[in-house]
Amino acid sequence: MANDKPHMNLAVIGHIDHGKSTTVGRLMFETGAVPAHIIENFRKEAESKGKGSFEFAWVMDNLKEERERGITIDIAHKRFDTAKFYFTVVDCPGHRDFVKNMITGASQADAAILVVAAPDGVMEQTKEHVFLARTLGITQLVIAINKMDAVNYDQKRFEEVKKELTQLIGMVGYKAAEILFIPMSSFKGVNISKKSPETPWYTGPTLLEALDTFKEPDKPTDKPFRLPIQDVYSISGIGTVPVGRIETGIMKKGMKVSFMPANKDGEIKSIEMHHEEQPQALPGDNVGFNVRGVGKNDIRRGDVCGPADIPPTVADEFTAQIVVLQHPSAITVGYTPVFHCHTAQIACTFVELRKKLDPRSGQTKEENPTFLKSGDAAIVQIKPSRPMVIESVKEIPQLGRFAIRDMGTTIAAGMCIAVQPKQMIR
């Protein structure tokens, strides 16, 4: 099935229980991506387990264990079409310990829907997700003020939440004037695909119309091919099949490739997308590909595939610009948290704190600071504990952004501004 519409990867972000999965389920239902009889089956099953309101969210939660726990765990790729685009949803789980999934999910997204429940307004994770979306390079955002049915579609409450959100997104550099705020109810289907009489005071677009205001992402096809691996399968009769999303460049059948830092070479035998074989694939495409000459155990999640003649850069050390989101005390030289960069998760050490910056202007405030605390921006030198692929944001921004986590929370986020490459023996 060739799809002539441009493709967008869409992250759905926001605090736990604000209705992210229900919103995705409703979008898929309203666009015909989920047949009505399947929704009906989900509804019956949900009612029998005492979770009547979960009917649309269950479209996403098609894993048994998740259904019973009532939460969405791993990132689920689902697709639906609007008039202008076809979207692949990168569903970003909302529970506290899943922020790292949010990081790897958001780094694959071209745009995001921020879901905020009208009764609660801005919550802790709303802030964290907005900050991460911005740091990870998501420039396009639609804000869904959800659960309006729970506040009787009150315009005053909508305006209060909108004001709160306008301040929050302004702090991280989004321009509120360019962002659409939609009063809606995913559960009731209000303002998703058609205007609702419940909100006569609202004259703006529906959620689906708002998604079509996004600008088509530039496809960085002129850059070297890069694909961070999400999973590796071994399929009988076919062989080794890595899966991932192309970040830059063009992937072609017959191409000679290198996997780094595994330092393994192979050849692409076939490429599959949405269960159909393709001769080539472009940035933004989620693909599985069969590779000759590489065993399942030779490569793993976090490795990056690139052309054999321009392999991905493996860092010995790298220089980064970071913003500290929250740290219980202070970051000093020697601190070794976990860096989440594309699909890799690697412990890295702060070997030098070069300068503290003014987070708004980027001007240097202090040379060689002794520590960094929450709210500080800085230029730092980092040494990975084992080989990792990271690229300068000037060269390949998609592989230059990262989040730093420790003790189950996101400590900081940042980008790589220079790499001291490790010499790989070929």
Swiss-Prot record:
Belongs to the TRAFAC class translation factor GTPase superfamily. Classic translation factor GTPase family. EF-Tu/EF-1A subfamily. Residues 5-221 form the tr-type G domain. Residues 146-149 are annotated as: G4. One of its GO terms (molecular function) is translation elongation factor activity. Its main location: cytoplasm. It is found in: Cytoplasm. Its EC number is 3.6.5.3. It is an enzyme of class 3 (hydrolase). PROSITE patterns: G_TR_1, G_TR_2. GTP binds at residues 14-21, 91-95, 146-149. Residues 185-187 are annotated as: G5. Residues 14-21 are annotated as: G1. Mg(2+) binds at residue 21. This is Elongation factor 1-alpha. CDD domains: EF1_alpha, EF1_alpha_II, EF1_alpha_III. GO terms for cellular component: cytoplasm. GTP hydrolase that promotes the GTP-dependent binding of aminoacyl-tRNA to the A-site of ribosomes during protein biosynthesis. The lineage of its organism: Archaea, Methanobacteriati, Methanobacteriota, Stenosarchaea group, Methanomicrobia. Coiled coil: none annotated. Residues 70-74 are annotated as: G2. Residues 91-94 are annotated as: G3.
